[in-house]
Amino acid sequence: MLPAFSPIFRRLLPAVTFERLLRFWRTLAQQTGDGVQCFVGDLPSSLKPPPGPSVLEAEVDHRFALLVSPGQWALLEGEQISPHHYAVSITFAQGIIEDFIQKQNLPVVAEAMPHRPETPSGPTIAEQLTLGLLEILNSDSTSFSPEPSLQDSLQASQVKLLSQVIAQIRQSLDLSEILNNAVTAVQKFLFVDRLVIYQFHYSQPSLTPLEENQIPAPRPRQQYGEVTYEARRSPEIDTMLGIMTENDCFSQVFSYEQKYLKGAVVAVSDIENHYSSSYCLVGLLQRYQVRAKLVAPIIVEGQLWGLLIAHQCHHPRQWLDSEKNFLGQIGEHLAVAIVQSLLYSEVQKQKNNFEKRVIERTKELRDTLMAAQAANLLKSQFINNISHELRTPLTSIIGLSATLLRWFDHPASLPPAKQQYYLLNIQENGKKLLDQINSIIQLSQLESGQTALNCQSFSLHTLAQTVIHSLLGVAIKQQINLELDYQINVGQDQFCADQERLDQILTQLLNNALKFTPAEGTVILRIWKESNQAIFQVEDTGIGINEQQLPVLFEAFKVAGDSYTSFYETGGVGLALTKQLVELHGGYIEVESSPGQGTIFTTVIPQQNFPPTTKGQVQDKLDAAMPFNSSVIVIEQDEEIATLICELLTVANYQVIWLIDTTNALQQVELLQPGLIIVDGDFVDVTEVTRGIKKSRRISKVTVFLLSESLSSAEWQALSQKGIDDYLLKPLQPELLLQRVQSIQQEPLR
């Protein structure tokens, strides 16, 4: 049953027929006379499509005729959808007509209308209009199907609209704009109350829980969706935009998926009859005023992307074959637009990724270039500084020695006191040159990880007294007060670390402080303990250091650029070497200074893990841990080094055999079958001997110990993979050699 407010007539009619209906409305008002008025006109411009660049928009002629009588109201509307055709509707519903008058702001019509239609005594206006309508339709042969000329015109209009949709797809990459404009244009063309795009979303497959000890079965992925685009004939039509599906109600719709995937267009002329078995679905559609619908699929890459749905509200509608074909073609072209948009999005994504990679790669290249430039600058700075630091003592040595040589050929000899002065100067500069070279070598070994600590227990007070005594002469000569502030009790005086390295650290810091402090100044060495750490603090009353120069103070060959640098005559590596030695102990060094306020260097050294040992204790431990096979083969060309190793190991109760080189070494090892081999030589020869040892079944368990002057981490990694078990750097440290031999001999057989 039709709602009370539904139009009684809605058809596509030729423009000529619509004009005849308008004239009939006027004629009926004139013929009826008393109290009957007819208002005819165009709708205000606000009802026409807004101007814009869209190729889908066109001017719409929207006209009306309102017949007002005491007994009945009648509204005729016609909306031009093509040059020769109108979408026509007729209604007698009072509520619709009142809303129409109020919406169109027609005060003249409102004043002429009675508050309530009177009950007519004779034939009603509706009856007369119905009879006249049938007469006009029959005379024009319009009946319930369009005449051939109308069909041809509709087909031409469909082709034109399709061309416009295709043109916009080609012109625009904005999918939202394409879909919005297409929905609006198709809604107007089909003269439907609502046209929507229902877009599907697919959830991931899930597992159906089963009984215990059963394998869960995969559940097919579920599809759901929402209305993403919409066009309505008027605001009175409820919106469905953003409406999500209700799976229970739409189960019947989902059964059409296979049909939709084949491109079928589904037409439902009356939902109440078509879905009579589904009360839920009918109730849902009626909630949004849907009475008839036409559905076309949008298939993208073999998947049902969405549905293009036309809704006719309030009354049934018989869908024409041309309308079905047209909506199906629109769905196909929209699918093309979606594929085009997806491809464009993928291209944009690839483009953005490529641009990101280009930016990252450019940054990497820029960073690499800057690092190379910095390294080149540092190398140049290193060469300049080291050449200057080495050239200064060399110049003095060469100059003074040349002077002495010239005096040997001179008739008058150089006074002995002068000769002694020159020779002492040469000796002093030679020692300075040697110290600089040793510092550079030591720093290089520290940075490459080739330096090991020789930790032992010693007296901190004795160390402090030794360092102060060695620099006391320099302090007196420069008229500087050198003080020791020792804050450790006698019972806590012992400390475990590398005594030689600590002596070097303190000497370097004190020597710099003396050079940094002017006459009548003070330099203090302060020592105390905190927990398992020893703190060494060197404080002076010199000119201080600018805050900007502190970050580069511990970097090798960095030029600070002021008078502070001139005091450090250590080849540019003094403080850098000090910092490396401190960090080798696992400690750290800090500096506090400001111009004119002096400088404080604070060094923190943690107690090392090596226990205090004596020569007798080492011997006792070696005796206790001596393995059954105590024979050792030493392969060493240097007689002095070989003699030292043999004497150390012999005292430790090892049986030592000395081989000069690796020639026939494999045969000797197989014959003697030692527990340990200490080998020194070319890496190629050493690896060749080691390979033969590890391949031999009789001696494959023998431990191989390598001696080398220097060894990088990469070289050691390569050598260890070829069978070498451990290494020790030269010059040899006897205590460390015995500890390494003991640790290797205590390891379980491999």
From Swiss-Prot:
The modification 4-aspartylphosphate is found at D680. Keywords: ATP-binding, Biological rhythms, Cell cycle, Cell division, Kinase, Nucleotide-binding, Phosphoprotein, Transferase, Two-component regulatory system. PROSITE patterns: HIS_KIN, PHYTOCHROME_2, RESPONSE_REGULATORY. The N-terminal domain is followed by a GAF (phytochrome-like) domain that lacks the conserved Cys residue for ligand binding, a histidine kinase domain and a C-terminal response regulator domain (pseudo-receiver domain, PsR). Functions in an input pathway to the Kai circadian clock. Senses oxidized quinones via its C-terminal pseudo-receiver domain, providing a link between cell metabolism and the clock. Affects the ratio of phosphorylated to unphosphorylated KaiC, binds quinones via its pseudo-receptor domain. Quinone-binding destabilizes the protein rapidly. Autophosphorylates, does not transfer the phosphate to its pseudo-receiver (PsR) domain. May play a role in cell division. Also functions in a two-component CikA/RpaA output pathway from the circadian clock, negatively regulating kaiBC expression independently of labA and of sasA. One of three clock output pathways. Dephosphorylates phospho-RpaA, enhanced by KaiB and KaiC, has only modest kinase activity on RpaA. It comes from the Bacteria. Transmembrane segments: none annotated. Pfam families: GAF, HATPase_c, HisKA, Response_reg. One of its GO terms (biological process) is rhythmic process. SMART domains: GAF, HATPase_c, HisKA, REC. Residues 604-750 are annotated as: PsR domain, bind KaiB(fs). The gene is cikA. Residues 385-609 form the Histidine kinase domain. This is Circadian input-output histidine kinase CikA. The modification Phosphohistidine is found at H388. Its EC number is 2.7.13.3. In the N-terminal section; belongs to the phytochrome family. Signal peptide: none annotated. It catalyses: ATP + protein L-histidine = ADP + protein N-phospho-L-histidine. GO terms for molecular function: ATP binding; phosphorelay sensor kinase activity. It is an enzyme of class 2 (transferase). Residues 1-173 are annotated as: N-terminal domain. It comes from Synechocystis sp. (strain ATCC 27184 / PCC 6803 / Kazusa). Homodimer. Part of the circadian clock (KaiA, KaiB, KaiC, CikA, RpaA, SasA), the composition of which varies during the circadian cycle. KaiA and CikA compete for binding to KaiB(fs). Interacts with RpaA. Residues 631-745 form the Response regulatory domain.
